[in-house]
Regions:
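Active-site anion-handling motifs in enzyme catalytic cores
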Residues: 1-264
Length: 264
């Protein structure tokens, strides 16, 4: 079984190939399933497994979906072979509109990362950490907070490097969805922020995720190039989610009698 990971790197921005949410599907599936038949693919081949990310625009008819999400409305590219779980109810709605069967099993599999790693929070060195989406990383709003002692966390630092960085802060601000999801996974208080508002798909994936974990819809706090540490202290930080990890894991395709032969 080939597990799909979207490669957004290019000659100008090669490090985007390491965007955290795009590089965790393969290790998640390989570790949780214990399958020896798992392969990684960055290609839009038919018959792949879609797991983490807003990647349902890359669907083919033979694909399986376990946790993936839509980037926006009307972006489902094909009818997959079977859907086991999706990121949230907005994604499910996009599938059902097209007549595609989709169970009400929700959850971004990135929330399972603590189950396959050994990272523990001890004594954070920084009070605040900012995770800019990679389209936001060079903006004045980021530099402004960096000068005030906020730890700037690179979402493209690498699978383990990124986790180590978020372990080092008390409160997370993020314009990246997977910055928020990673924070939730390890129980780090977090808040969505907007920097440039250039994210493709707008609020869709954020709302989809909020609904999946029973969180009030959050459109984000707008950072300015004059934002102060005092302003950050007034933001409402999320600290809890409603997430049934066992239900998501039990919905996995390698546990389905019809599809387990693809994994073992």
């Amino acid at each position: 079984m080939k597990v799909f990971e979207y490669d957004n790197g290019n000659e100008i921005n090669p490090k985007r190939s390491k965007n955290w949410g795009d590089i965790i599907s393969y290790p998640l599936v390989k570790t949780i399933s214990q399958s020896k038949k798992i392969e990684l693919t960055n290609d839009r081949v038919n018959g792949k497994l879609i797991v983490v990310g807003s990647v349902l625009q890359h669907l083919s008819e033979g694909d399986l979906v376990w946790g993936g999400g839509a980037i926006n409305q009307n972006h489902i590219s094909a009818r997959p072979k079977k859907v086991f779980a999706v990121r949230g109810p907005l994604t499910r709605n996009e599938l059902t509109i097209k007549g595609i069967d989709c169970p009400r099993v929700y959850g971004d599999p990135a929330l399972l990362m603590p189950y396959i790693t050994d990272y523990k929070r001890t004594s954070p060195k920084y009070k605040y950490g900012l995770i800019p989406h990679y389209v936001d990383e060079n903006e004045l709003e980021v530099e402004n907070l960096k000068k005030q002692g906020v730890k700037i966390i690179d979402i493209c630092a690498g699978l383990h490097e990124f986790i180590e960085d978020i372990m080092d802060v008390e409160f997370i601000l993020s314009s990246s969805l997977h910055g928020l999801i990673a924070s939730d996974a390890w129980g780090i208080p977090n808040a969505r922020v907007n920097i440039t508002n250039k994210l493709y798909g707008g609020h869709f994936k954020f709302i989809d995720y909020c609904l999946s974990v029973n969180r009030k819809i959050d459109y984000g706090y707008q950072l300015l190039n004059t934002t102060t540490i005092g302003d950050l202290s007034k933001i409402r930080y999320n600290d809890k989610i409603s997430f049934n990890a066992e239900r998501l894991i039990n919905s996995a395709p390698w546990l389905d009698n019809q599809y387990k032969h693809l994994f073992y």
